[in-house]
From Swiss-Prot:
Organism this protein belongs to: Trypanosoma brucei brucei
GO CC, alphabetical: plasma membrane; side of membrane
Disulphide connectivity of cysteines: C47-C177, C155-C222
Propeptide: 476-492
Protein name: Variant surface glycoprotein MITAT 1.1
Pfam families tied to this protein: Trypan_glycop
Cleaved signal peptide residues: 1-32
SUPFAM superfamilies registered for this protein in UniProt: Variant surface glycoprotein (N-terminal domain), Variant surface glycoprotein MITAT 1.2, VSG 221, C-terminal domain
Lipid positions (GPI-anchor amidated serine): S475
Lineage: Eukaryota, Discoba, Euglenozoa, Kinetoplastea, Metakinetoplastina
Localization annotation: Cell membrane
Membrane topology: Lipid-anchor; GPI-anchor
One GO process term, biological-process aspect: symbiont-mediated evasion of host immune response
Length: 492
């Protein structure tokens, strides 16, 4: 019996020793990963995302310039048609050209208004949201990267707890990861990390003991990623709740499990409450104004499907009380010989072929309008032709006044001749009463009434005075009757 007891006691001691050894060595081999650093599989996608986000402000600047460039192209087209009309006031394509000029003017004004009130705001919103999210990511990654020293403190690791990520200028290990905001330059960019659906390359999950994003516990630790009161950053007392970092992407637990990464791959309305910064950057990205938007480009398709052109026809060419069905389409078809989209090409080609000679607006060589694209130069050319047109109006007005003066002078002389032809025949003179004739009993001859003669002479002098002063503010009705083509020119 004694021998048996001794053996049992010895066996018990051996088991106790073995158990102690297992307990002592267990943390180094199988303890949960709640206090180790963040694996590269988790932080590298964040680096890719923050690198992409750093380019959004430059991308928005580039998109804004593209929008303005598109509007300028439409403005250039408006200038060209206006120049053609100013240069060719008697063109047979007056209505078609005027309609096209009005279309381009509406598109230009509408595009500027749309960009001023809506488009620009969407681009600024996207740049702002991207910068805010990038700041949240950069701040925490920078903190994790900085928390290292010796063999124990490592918060950004590669694949195991003891190998910290190494910074080489703008890279962490082999991954571009500049935690700063670069200079804003207008550049196009490709979106791969923040797409129309969300953040497809970000990891998600964790929250257990499977070492998904934090490696097995070893010498290297990162207590910042654990809210456990024994193994994490709290002292003695447990935390009331879990901690949210990275703008809601990561949850640091207050139990002995690893951190949890939220699913940001497919964004939706639910993220607006749980991760507002991520939701805002995603939503803003999908609402950015782009140069290809209809507000900033020419309309396409059949003429009767182009809203701007139809609205212009209704305003300019149809009676206000028109109730005819498809009246706009009927008018467009009559003007352009059909409704196909290319029916305006004939008139636009005619405008582009118009030659602007050397000497106009400082040009040293002649060129067709189709080869001139700068809006400043086109504006100068239009101003030049408008000045020529204004001078032509002054010259024509003077010529018309001279003709009127001559006609009035001849009228007075002719009337006086008619009266004088009656000579001393009083009865014949009385028959010319309606012509302004009166019989002078003293001189015994038929004469033009004194007041009629004075009136005609006065009108003649007034006309002569206006001609000398080059007065260009005379009756428009006079010009309308005398120069209908000039009036048409002035209207355009």
């Amino acid at each position: 019996m004694a021998t048996g007891r001794a053996k049992n006691t010895k066996w018990a001691r051996w088991l106790s020793t073995a158990g102690l050894i297992i307990v002592v060595t267990l943390p180094a081999t199988t303890m949960a990963a709640e206090r180790t650093g963040l694996k590269a599989t988790a932080w590298k996608p964040l680096c890719k995302l923050t690198t992409e986000l750093s380019k959004v402000s430059g991308e928005m600047l580039n998109k804004g310039q593209e929008v303005i460039s598109n509007i300028q192209k439409i403005k250039a087209a408006e200038y060209k048609v206006s120049i053609y009309l100013a240069k060719n006031p008697e063109t047979q394509a007056l209505q078609q050209s005027t309609l096209l000029r009005g279309y381009f003017a509406r598109k230009t004004n509408g595009g500027l208004e749309s960009y001023k009130t809506m488009g620009l705001a969407t681009q600024i919103r996207s740049a702002r949201a991207a910068a805010y999210l990038k700041g949240s990511i950069d701040e925490f990654l920078n903190l994790l990267e900085s928390l290292k020293g010796g063999s124990e403190n490592k918060c950004l690791v590669t694949t195991n707890a003891d190998t910290a990520a190494t910074r080489r200028e703008t890279k962490l290990d082999d991954q571009e990861c500049a935690l700063s905001m670069p200079e804003t330059k207008p550049e196009a960019a490709t979106r791969t990390e923040l797409t129309q659906t969300g953040y497809p390359n970000l990891q998600h999950g964790g929250g257990g003991t499977a070492n998904t994003f934090q490696p097995t516990t070893s010498t290297g630790t990162c207590k910042l990623l654990s809210g456990h009161s024994t193994n994490g950053y709290p002292t003695t007392s447990a935390l009331d709740t879990t901690a949210k970092v990275l703008a809601g992407y990561m949850t640091i637990p207050n139990t002995q499990v690893e951190a949890t990464l939220a699913n940001m791959q497919a964004m939706g309305n639910g993220h607006k409450a749980t991760a507002p910064a991520w939701h805002e950057a995603w939503e803003a990205r999908n609402r950015e104004a782009k140069a290809k938007d209809l507000a900033y480009t020419n309309e396409t398709g059949n003429l009767d499907t182009q809203p701007t052109l139809k609205a212009l026809v209704k305003t300019l060419l149809l009676p206000k009380d028109n109730t005819e069905h498809n009246a706009e389409a009927t008018k467009l078809e009559a003007l352009f010989g059909g409704l196909a989209a290319d029916k305006t090409k004939t008139y636009l080609d005619m405008v582009d072929a118009e030659i602007i000679p050397a000497g106009i607006a400082g040009r040293t060589t002649e060129a067709p309008l189709g080869k001139i694209h700068d809006t400043v130069e086109l504006g100068d050319i239009l101003s030049n032709y408008e000045m020529i047109a204004a001078q032509n109006v002054v010259t024509l007005k003077k010529n018309l006044d001279a003709v009127s003066k001559k006609q009035q002078t001849e009228s007075a002389e002719n009337k006086e001749k008619i009266c004088n032809a009656a000579k001393d025949n009083q009865k014949a003179c009385e028959n010319l009463k309606e012509k302004g004739c009166v019989f002078n009993t003293e001189s015994n001859k038929c004469e033009l009434k004194k007041d009629v003669k004075e009136k005609l002479e006065k009108e003649s002098k007034e006309t002569e005075g206006k001609d000398e002063k080059a007065n260009t503010t005379g009756s428009n009705s006079f010009l309308i009757h005398k120069a209908p083509l000039l009036l048409a020119f002035l209207l355009f």
